[in-house]
Amino acid sequence: MKNRYIILGALFALSTGFTACDMDEEPQSSASVDMVFSAEKGLQTYAYSFYNVLPSRASASHRSETLDYGVKNTLSGMEVGAYTVNSATSWSWSDLRNINFFLENNTNEKVSESIRNNYNGIARLFRARFYFDKLVTYGPVPWIDKVFNDAEDPDLYNSQDTRDVIIGHIIDDLDYAYQHITQSDVTLNSTIVNKWTAAAFKSRVCLFEAAWRKYHANDELDVARTGCSQYSAEQLYQLAAAAAREVMDKGPYKLHTGTPYSEGRGAYRDLFISDNTVTTEVMFAVATDKTLGMGQANWWYNSSTYGPHLCMSRKFMNTYLNIDGTPYSDKHADGSYKTFVEDCTDRDLRFNQTVRGADYTRKDASGAYVPTAANFTGHTLTGYQFTKWVMDDVAYDDGENNDNDEPLMRYAEVLLNYAEAQAELGKLTDAEWAETIGALRARAGITGGTAQTGTLTTKPTAAEPYIAAYYPGVSNPVVLEVRREREIELALEGLRLNDLKRWNACDLWVNDPWQGVLIPALNTPLDMNGDGTYDAYFYDTDAIGDETYASIGVYVGTGKNNVLNVEKVNGGYLMKYNYAGRQWPQRQYLYPVPEVVIQFNPNLKQNPGW
């Protein structure tokens, strides 16, 4: 069973009590400590407990529920008031105590130094992950590298350290992990970390902090006002590029290619619907096992009653290039809007491997693959229904049935991290563009480009108007195209919200109109995917009784919340979904420190605006 080692680790941690609940929990007995730390097997088993912090198998496929281009029927966590000084609940340190306990006690000389250092490297990688999550969530926090065994320990009452201190320790931990983790080959189903995980994660961390310092330099979250001078944005971009380059030059990974595209399936989507991790590219993953019913992507994305009906917005889907590398326009020369079939034709192949395209087929109950349009009856609010994590067999749809492994880190991200860091530094060469952005576009079937979008071998020299309007305030054409590539390649992989935060761009979530596909006409049966069969009947008066296609009531206009609106345009109607309350005040970029925590430790400072 693919996840047996992680399960064993979780059971061991629970049975021995090493995952402490509080920072000042009672110390373990010397006998139990010696039992674990006197042999490599004990270190290995303890180290499995670190993996319990990873996304669950049930949630890993929908970590991007909160993002700008995702339309859904709830704001759930993004709205003003979603977290307050009285409701913030993520100020938890038990996972850190578990790691620090290991590091303090892994000193038994019965185990060789190299073996101890290997497991210390794994522990420090997970400590870096813990602190990066805290930095993204709260900004500066106290740095703690010891176990508190005394409630009177004065260090329990420390104030926050600066971002410099935190990011410096994270970098130190990741450097140590890279140097001392002995596993350098691809691991089984990529469920166990290796040294390349540390290097790739360093590129992610440094890229985040570099962008945060650049794009938040003049707002109320300005890092300069918190005593940060050790790391500049430029230095952090350099560190991000160097870490990514280490993986690119020395690691065992490459882009997965070779599967020809057909009916919504190809090399790109292989990465997300394979029952065994595609380890040539996927560097770290959550494994699932169908017999245990662990995955639920189909249930979450294809159910009319479960999940928030997350789907893509039209504004985002228009960023996908044409297959020849030219920008896409959703209008004809006469100004009329293109149909959904036209939207899906001759586009970047990731379009039809992320949402149901016009050529998409599913395996029905009889075992036959049949053309399948988006399901408008409670499943999709825009017509751009996700397939990226979804198995194509309808048998997976009801309950936790998915057995496809779920990537947490891919080599593609490393390429994008490198390209962005170099672009921000003004150093990305045509050769580097070709081995990063060009390689990703080539896998997506793109054959060329323009001076504005770049080709497969040359970076752009002028800004393409649509992507420039998408990211106002950014004028560098190379940075803009790298962002286009990043948002498309990594869509729905849990990175988008952090990207918006570091770019100071969460207003994109506020301003996306949440429009959907073109509905050519109301009150008439429509063939939405062009297969010759009617799929839907959108009505603003009375439903139709024919059960061979869906009947969907809509409101003509754009003034209704929480219902399907349709907006009159040249050539028909655009679907539109409204949800009141989309705002993003500046303070929202950081969570508040919970009031109860400040009451316990008055030396902690509240974040700006809270």
Predicted regions and their residues:
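Short coil/linker segments at helix-helix boundaries
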Residues: 140-163, 212-238
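Bacterial Sec-dependent N-terminal signal peptides
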Residues: 2-5, 13-41, 170, 203, ...
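Conserved, well-structured interaction surfaces
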Residues: 35-44, 49, 54-55, 72-138, ...
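Flexible, polar/acidic helix-loop-strand segments at domain edges
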Residues: 281, 336-411, 606-610
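Short coil/turn linking the two alpha-helices of tandem helical-hairpin repeats
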Residues: 135-137, 142, 205-217, 424-427
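Long, intrinsically disordered, low-complexity segments
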Residues: 21-23, 92-95, 169-171, 249, ...
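Membrane-proximal, proline-rich intrinsically disordered regions
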Residues: 21-62, 324, 328-331, 338, ...
